[in-house]
C-alpha cells in the first residue's frame, strides 16, 4: 500500500523485533524499512499437495522460525536476534512516495475527512446530498456530502461488508447478521428487513425501485425497495456472493465464490446462462469484480490475473487474456468504448470494448 511509511515511522521508536504475517502462499523473509518481518505460509496444501503450518521457537536471545509439513520433520528457515539491533530507531523510512504530481492539479483538494473509529470495507453510496457508509462495527452512517457532518446512523447486528445503494429516499444494505435492511435515507429509520439464512456480504444495485443483492445462503434476491417484498429469489448459487451485480435492460449478472458468473432474467430471476471459463479452483472465482458491459459483451477480471470478454446473450467466451496480469478490478468509460483495470504491478491498463480479440490501447505506471 502507498502509506506503508506511516506504519514503519510510527513503530520505529519502539523495540520492534519482528513483524509477523500469515496465510500467505509461501514463506518469505522480508524487511520493512529495515525492520525484520516474515510472511508465513497458510495451512492449506502447498504445490506438492501437503498441508503444513509454522512454528516459532522463542529463546532467551532469538526467534527461530520453522515450517512443519505434515508427515515430515520440521525445517528451520529463518532466525532473528532478540539482542542485535536491526535498524536505527531514530531513523526514517528508506524512501517515501513522490507526491509532486499533486502540484499539477491544484484544483483537486480534500474537502473533508471524518474518523469513524471502525474499519471500512465497502465503498460509499451517494444519494443527492447524502453519503452512506457501512463499517466493521455494523453501523450504516449517513454524512452530509457538502461537509462530512454526521446526520444519523443505524446499527445492524454485525459488520457491513457490501456496498450499500440508495434511491427514492431508501438506502438498502446487507449485514453479516443475516439481514437485508431498507432504511429511510432522510432519518435512518427502519422501513423493512428481509431475513437470509447466512451473512449478507453482497453489494447492492438499485434500478427502478428494485434492489438486487446476493447473500451467502446460495440465494440472489430482487427486492422492492419501498415495501421490502421479495419479487424473486434465485437459489442456484453454490458459493457466497460479495460483488455488486450488473443490471442491464433484461439481465442481472454477478459472480460468486464458486468459479461461476451468473446471468439471470431480470423479470423473474430465471437462469439464462452460467460462465466458468474452465476455472477449477474456488480462489480463481470472478467473485470480487464488479462486471461491466458494452458492445454486447460482459467484461470481468479474476484472481487468475486474466481479463475476459463474454457474450452477454449466451455466456460464451469471446476472448480471455493474461497479457496485463490484472486482478479483480474493471471499469468502463462513459462512452462504452474502453475498459480499464489495474494490475498487480502498480499499473493501469486500457482495452478496447469493440472486436472479438483483446486489444490493449495503453498502459500507464
Residue ranges and their predicted role:
Residues 2-57:
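Conserved beta-sheet core of the metallophosphoesterase superfamily
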Residues 57-119, 125:
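A short C-terminal boundary segment appended to hydrolase-like catalytic domains
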Residues 105-125, 151-167, 176, 190-207, ...:
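Extracytoplasmic beta-rich repeat domains
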Residues 144-148, 184-188, 224-228, 265-269, ...:
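Short loop/turn segments that connect beta-strands within beta-propeller blades
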